[in-house]
C-alpha cells in the first residue's frame, strides 16, 4: 500500500467523523469511496440512461466528495481544488444549455446561446459553496427555435430551463445556485441578452462596476465562439487605454460605495466580519479590481 492510500483513507475517516454533509455522501456512495481509495478522483456513478437532471445532481455529489477527500488528504492544493470545482460548473452549465435546446428543438444544432462565466467561476476560483453568476447571451440569427417563436421568447425559455436544471432540488440535492443579476438592469431586462444589443450597451452605457465584472470573464459554456466574439468586442470597453476625468470620477465613486456598503463601520474585534468588514476580503478584492481597471488597458500584465 502506498503513502497516498493511507492519506486518502485517513481523510475519509476524518471527513466522516467531522462533517455531517461528507458523512452522508460517504454512506450513500460506497462504490465511489472504494474507487477514491485507489487514487481515482475522476470517478462517477452517473449512468447514461439516467435523466439529465439526475445525472447532473449525482455528478455534483461525486465532485463534492472526490474534491473534499483530495483536499483533506493533501493530494490537492488549493489551485487544484478550485480548478476542479470550476470545471464542474462549466461542464454542468454546458450540459444544461445543450439539454434545454435539445428538449425544444431535438434536430437542431446546439448553437446561438452562450454563458459567460464571471467572478470566481471566470478565474477558476470557485469554492465548495460558491454560486455562479453567468451572463447569458444569444444570437437571434442562429438560435434554434420553434415555428413562429420569436428569438427572444426562445432564448428566455431556454435560459429558464437551464436555471431549473441547475437549481431544482430533490433527494439528491441540487447542482448549482445561479444568480443572473449581473446583467444590465436585471429588474427590467430579460434573463438572456441578444448579443448585438449587449455589445452596444457595454460600449456606450455601462458603469465602472460593470467593467469590473468582466475583469475575469470568459466564454464558459454553450456556443463558446459566440461568447468569445462578445468578449472580444467589449474588450476595449473593459480595458481602456486612456481614462477621462469622468471615468476616473466614476471609479472613485465606485470605490467609496464599496467601502460604505461592505465596511458598515466594522473594526477589528468581536463579531468582525472577515469577508465584508473594513479591510476584509471583499474590500481587498475590489481594491485590486480598481487598479486593474485603471492600469489594465496599458499594461496587460
Regions found by a protein language model. Give the residues of each.
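A nucleotide- and high-energy phosphate-metabolite-utilizing enzyme signature
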Residues: 1-301
